[in-house]
UniProtKB/Swiss-Prot annotation:
GO biological process: tRNA methylation; tRNA wobble uridine modification
Protein residues bound to NAD(+): 270-284
Function as written in the Swiss-Prot or TrEMBL entry: NAD-binding protein involved in the addition of a carboxymethylaminomethyl (cmnm) group at the wobble position (U34) of certain tRNAs, forming tRNA-cmnm(5)s(2)U34.
Protein name: tRNA uridine 5-carboxymethylaminomethyl modification enzyme MnmG
Gene: mnmG
Transferase listed as a keyword: no
Any one Gene Ontology molecular-function term assigned to this protein's record: flavin adenine dinucleotide binding
Main location: cytoplasm
Length: 622
């Protein structure tokens, strides 16, 4: 077996799979280290991909030729576009997935890279020399050399499961944790913290009274995540919706002292936006019910995931809770819910490439950086894998900023501000939402992926054809024009100002849709419907996009002012507080400095003026 690689990726979850695949696409000799190949691509918690903000990340991973979108399309059994009634900028594609189909599709994808080897075993220690990573050691003593290592351990890093009064070391239920790597991090001086997450009990769907719950169908037709998926062919299912009751809340209140979160057994912080059911009852006790989504875990699997009742209460209490919920009174619990604590690294220890500042060649992605969610992990994995391969090969860095995409927003939030709780992506975190839409991820990022060398031949050809078709369709819509009087004959009420308006102009009106302009100009009928959607969205947002483009240009000017080698003690006019914060965090740019707490606009002005003076000095002496 080969013992030396360009890149080694530790962990076969969503971050690890994307990291290994990204490194392999760049051409790096890559190894993926995992306890068992059978668990690669496993969905540890909810059987779903995407959602608000998260769906944007999946589309961005797909735009860079990542795996998650295509794998979700292969395993998806219910697709829904969330926020469909709102504007395109905040719509979120989501898919319920068959766990077995998803994992199988991911494993096939991983096996499809000839330069990607899978090594089964537990990574026990990092190896390094002269400030740079040199490889890893497994628990069985085997050593593997590498120019770059990506760690994506998820909840396995010194993982500890809690169920009622019991607790035991584990990375997932019935799977061993990764214990040795934490010692390596501590030996290197990394600041480690503890976070917590949880999962609900699993139910036998054959024992649920489906007639007592509301049924929720998916979209028809289903809209795929990946632009390379022509249509969804997997059979589609419905999900159920029920609610907790006052009786449920009484059971929880009577036993909340037995919850590890409230007994003092768990001290770490859990995800704010995915609270346990006991947290909901304690913090929102005035509500008469909390919604529960009953999500089947597979087409041929009776297991149902009750989304909304994550808990670590004792098993007998969980059974008592289920008996109080409509439709679940006689359900059989296949596996209890539980909470899990795990180590994470302070993400402020990272560069925007996700390389650590302390050890060159070491990259981190996923929950180890303090995030929560499959999609957040996948996006980080892709960025870390790209940069690990580029680092190993002596290439340029792959950095995505806040105007590039949600993956840039997330990484900047992490490395600039750090975290106090598990980080989850929302559309509200992005300043440039109008340009960072789920529908245009490929238009924003695929060209950048092509330049980096991570986009394959199939996507490259598809992207070229799509962009040409979009350009032609937009040009056609802009070339066709009509007067207000002529428009009135077609039922369109425009201001009678005598000005001709193009089809593109008409589409900018909120009440005018593509079908109406196509009825006026039959030649628009030759435009592919998928392309027409993009033209209409671009028209609707046209004026706002022009304004946001100016904002992005100003942002990029600040991002171009580098601070890497600045001696803040030599910058006159800075307050002691600003100087201390800048020294502590060492931001890369003036833009990043502005996103630190306590750095005022005045301090930014002083920094910008100082940099301009230094630049003039270098030019005059150069």
């Amino acid at each position: 077996m080969r013992t030396s690689f360009d890149v080694i990726v530790i962990g076969g979850g969503h971050a690890g799979c994307e990291a290994a695949a990204a490194a392999a696409r760049i051409g790096a000799a890559t190894a993926l280290v995992t306890h068992r190949f059978a668990t690669v691509g496993a969905m540890s918690c909810n059987p779903a991909i995407g959602g608000l903000g998260k769906g944007h990340l999946v589309r961005e991973v797909d735009a860079l030729d990542g795996l998650m979108g295509r794998v979700a399309d292969a395993g998806g059994i219910q697709f829904r576009m969330l926020n469909r009634r709102k504007g395109p900028a905040v719509r979120g594609p989501r898919a319920q997935a068959d766990r077995k189909l998803y994992a199988a599709a991911m494993q096939i994808a991983i096996q499809g890279f000839p330069n990607l080897s899978v090594i089964e075993g537990e990574a026990d220690a990092l190896l390094w020399q002269d400030g740079r990573v040199s490889g890893i050691r497994l628990g069985d003593g085997r050593e593997f050399a590498a120019a770059a290592v990506v760690i994506t351990t998820g909840t396995f890093l010194r993982g500890l499961i809690h169920l009622g009064e019991r607790s035991w070391p584990a990375g997932r239920i019935d799977e061993a944790p990764a214990m040795g790597l934490s010692s390596s991090f501590e030996a290197l001086g990394f600041k480690l913290g503890r976070l917590k997450t949880g999962t609900p009990p699993r139910l036998d769907g054959r024992t649920i009274d489906w007639s007592a719950v509301e049924m929720q169908p998916g979209d028809d037709p289903a809209e795929p995540f990946s632009v390379l998926t022509p249509a969804i062919t997997t059979p589609q299912i419905e999900c159920g919706i029920t609610r907790t009751t006052p009786a449920t809340h009484e059971v929880i209140r009577a036993n909340v002292h037995r919850s590890p979160m409230y007994s003092g057994q768990i001290q770490s912080t859990g995800p704010r936006y995915c609270p346990s059911i006991e947290d909901k009852i304690v913090k929102f006790g005035d509500r008469d019910g909390h919604q529960i989504f009953l999500e089947p875990e597979g087409l041929d699997d009776p297991t149902v995931y009750p989304n909304g009742i994550s808990t670590s209460l004792p098993e007998e209490v969980q059974r008592a809770i289920l008996k109080t919920i409509p439709g679940l009174e006689r359900t059989e619990m296949l596996r209890p819910g539980y909470a899990i604590e795990y180590d994470h690294v302070d993400p402020r220890e990272l560069e925007p490439t996700l390389q650590t500042k302390r050890l060159r060649g070491l990259f981190l992605a996923g929950q180890i950086n303090g995030t929560t969610g499959y999609e957040e992990a996948a996006a980080q994995g892709l960025v870390a894998g790209l940069n690990a391969a580029l680092s190993a090969g002596g290439g340029d860095r792959a950095v995505f900023d806040r105007a590039d995409g949600y993956l840039g927003v997330m990484i900047d939030d992490l490395v600039t501000r750090g975290i106090t709780e598990p980080y989850r992506m929302f559309t509200s975190r992005a300043e440039y939402r109008l340009t960072l839409r789920a529908d245009n991820a490929d238009q924003r990022l695929t060209d950048k992926g092509l330049a980096l060398g991570c986009v394959g031949v199939e996507r490259s050809a598809f992207h070229h054809d799509k962009m040409a078709a979009l350009s032609d369709a937009k040009a056609l819509a802009q070339s066709l024009s009509i007067t207000p009087n002529e428009a009135a004959k077609h039922g369109l009420a425009l201001n009678r100002d005598g000005q001709r308006r193009s089809a593109f102009d008409l589409l900018s009106y909120p009440e005018i849709e593509w079908a109406q302009v196509r009825a006026i100009w039959p030649e628009l009928g030759k435009v592919d419907p998928a392309i027409a959607v993009h033209v209409e969205i671009d028209a609707k947002y046209h004026v706002y996009l022009e304004r946001q483009t100016a904002d992005v240009e100003a942002f990029r000017r600040d991002e171009s002012l580098g601070l890497t080698d600045v001696d803040y003690a030599a910058v006159p006019g800075l307050s002691n507080e600003a100087r201390t914060r800048l020294e502590r965090h060492r931001p890369h740019t003036v833009g990043q400095a502005g996103r630190l707490d306590g750095i005022t606009p005045a301090a930014l002005g002083i920094l910008a003026a100082y940099l301009r003076r230094e630049q003039r000095k270098r030019k005059s002496t150069g």
